[in-house]
Amino acid sequence: MKHFITCLALAFVALNASAQTLWRGAPMNASPAEIRALMPEIQDTSPAQRALDRGALLQIPSTLIADEDFAVTYHFEAERLQRIHLHAKVPTPARTQTLLRALQVTLRTSYGLPIGTKARQDANALPGSVDLKWAFRRMTVQLQMVDGTTVNLTYATNIPSRPAAL
């Protein structure tokens, strides 16, 4: 009986240890080479972008999501994927609201209710600004709209890229 319980516990651990993915199947802590192999349309970021953010190594300059054009940037720390940032500049506030509704429905379906909404302290923030956050296993997903036409969607790991020193 003791062996059965041990085997059952190990099987449970193995099932939960499977690689968790961020956006479009990109595994957490994947290397840039692994992401390139997974997504053939991916490109290196420009030297100017890397100068602003050393971790922003890969990008998809344009991809359609809910009928809007997004730029996607893959951020790495110690050569391990930590964050994927999707950015869209939508032409009109009405289309922005349509996009936000579509994204919220998808995110709620995938991850449940958001864990938080951040109250904006910025006096320039428009009424109806969105800042929602979801937590799912070892990642967070954040959906933001601040200026009426810019939408940011960020998938980030909640696990360190390398063990902390003692």
Summary of predicted features, one role per range:
Residues 19-57, 87-166:
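Non-cytosolic coordination micro-motifs
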Residues 2-8:
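Sec-dependent signal peptide recognition
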